Every structure is written in C-alpha cells, then in structure tokens.
Amino acid sequence: MVNWTKTEKATITDIFSHLDYDDIGPKALSRCLIVYPWTQRYFSGFGNLYNAAAIIGNAKVAEHGIKVLHGLDLGLKKMDNIEAAYADLSSLHSEKLHVDPDNFKLLSDCITIVLAAKLGSAFTAETQATFQKFLGAVMSALGKQYH
C-alpha cells in the first residue's frame, strides 16, 4: 500500500485535470512501440507496425493508447487502494495476454516523456517525482498477479 501526502494527491489530481488523453495516449504508446520494438509482439492484430510512420498513423495504436491512459484514471480514483483497483487488469495481463511485466515500466517511461514534453516547465522535478511514484504504484499493482 502506498502512502500519499495531501500534496501528492493534489499534484496527481492536477496532472490528470490537464491530460489531453487523445494526444498523450497515442503518442506514448507509439513511442513505446517505436523505441522498444519487441513490445510490438502484443499488438499483432493492429495491422501495419513496420516503421515509425506506420505506427504513428495506426488508428488501432491511437485508440489503445487512449484506452491505456484512461486506465490510469482507475488509479486516480482509488489512490488509497491501487493494488485492489488493478487486480482484474493484473490477472488479464498475466493470465490471458501474457504481457511481460517489464513492459509496464517501458510504457510508463514513455507516458512520462510525452507528458513532460506537453507540460513543459510546469512538469517540475517535484511533479515528476510524484507522477513517477503514482506510475510505480500502478505498475506494481499490474504486476501483482505475476508474483
């Protein structure tokens, strides 16, 4: 269980209030698939992922990126019990999809990079530290079923 200060909760809530899901989600997932091409194996049904332009222009990648980013809303709503909030998704990713849990870290790094680029100077070191703590809690919860 993660302990959150009032300031951390306020910071996470503020970040989510400014998220442009339709922009950040597709960019983050595209970046992950381009920078870490082995992650593409989980998206074989998405069609053409042969190069960066194809990935960036792929509607299924964009749609799933938005879905993933909205998946973080669950953690925002249940910050005091993130592990339980993601129990079903952890089971899905480990038992049905067989996703290597190390990929959660790769995607979270890409989300952070895209968010930092979007927010610019507003994404201070303190803001990043809090956001990384949040993503770390989500990644841990998603990986729980693997332990």
Curated annotation (Swiss-Prot):
One of its GO terms (molecular function) is peroxidase activity. Keywords: Heme, Iron, Metal-binding, Oxygen transport, Transport. Residues 3-147 form the Globin domain. One of its GO terms (biological process) is hydrogen peroxide catabolic process. Heme b binds at residues 64, 93. GO terms for cellular component: blood microparticle; haptoglobin-hemoglobin complex; hemoglobin complex. Red blood cells. InterPro entries: Globin (IPR000971), Globin-like_sf (IPR009050), Globin/Proto (IPR012292), Hemoglobin_b (IPR002337), Hemoglobin_oxygen_transport (IPR050056). PANTHER family: HEMOGLOBIN FAMILY MEMBER (PTHR11442), HEMOGLOBIN SUBUNIT EPSILON (PTHR11442:SF7). Involved in oxygen transport from gills to the various peripheral tissues. Belongs to the globin family. Heterotetramer of two alpha chains and two beta chains. This is Hemoglobin subunit beta. It comes from Gymnodraco acuticeps (Antarctic dragonfish). The gene is hbb.
